[in-house]
Amino acid sequence: MLFRSDEACAMVLGDNIFFGDGFSHILKKAADNAENKNRATIFGYHVNDPERFGIVEFDKDGKVLSVEEKPKHPKSNYCITGLYFYPAGVSKMANEVKPSARGELEITTLNDMYLKEDRLDVQLLGRGYAWLDTGTMDSLLEASNFVQIISKRQNFVISAPEEIAFKYGWIDRDELLESAKHYGKSPYGEHLKAVAEGKAE
C-alpha cells in the first residue's frame, strides 16, 4: 500500500464513478476533516448485496462502529465506496498494514486502524447520488448506459476535467480554449469551446 507523501490526501479507485448534485461540497467537507481535524472519511452507499463489498456499520448518530471486508454476515447494507480522505500521517499507518486472511493488503484494515483511534467518519451518499463500480463487464456497461442517458437527456457533459478546472479558477479562458483545440471538432472539444465562450448550458 503506497502513499506518495505524508500529507493529507484523497484516494479514489479508478473504476469508481460518482454522480450527484452538490458532490463537490461533500468532498470539501471531507478534505477539511482530513486537513484541519486530523480525521479520515469514508463514503457509505446503500446496496442490496453487501456481502460483495467492504461494509461500514454505524449508529443512529452516524458514528462508525465497525468496518468489514466482504463479510459473510454483513452488519449493515452500507458498502464503503472507493473514495477515501486521510489526514497527514497516513503513509506511516499504511506501512503498518499486514496482509489479511485472504493474503491481501486491504484498505479496510487501514480504515479499521483509524476507527480504533476514533478518527474515522462516514459520509453517506443518499438519494440523488449514484455510485457505480465498473469492475466487471456488466457493471461497466451499466455505467456507460447511465452516463449516456444522463448526457443525452440533460444535454451536458459529465465530469469534464478541463471544465471543472476552469470553474474553480485553476486554468483561465485561454488555457481552456487551448485544451479544446486538442479535441478538434469532436463533441467534447466543442463543449469545452462553448464553456470558454460562455455559451454552454
Where in this protein do the model-derived segments appear?
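Conserved beta-loop-beta/alpha segment of the NTase-like Rossmann-fold superfamily
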Residues: 1-60, 85-86, 94-95
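Short, solvent-exposed polar/charged micro-motifs at secondary-structure junctions
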Residues: 51-54, 131-135, 168
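Residue-level recognition of short, well-ordered coil/turn positions
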Residues: 35-38, 119, 170
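Short, amphipathic C-terminal "tail helix"
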Residues: 170-171, 175-201
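Generic helix-packing signal
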Residues: 4, 34, 147-148, 169
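Catalytic-core segments of class I nucleotidyltransferases/pyrophosphorylases
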Residues: 10, 24, 31-32, 63-162, ...
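Flexible, glycine-rich loop/tail regions that form catalytic "lids" or insertion modules at the edges
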Residues: 125, 151, 161-169, 194-201
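Juxtamembrane helix-loop transition sites at the ends of transmembrane segments
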Residues: 36, 157, 190-193
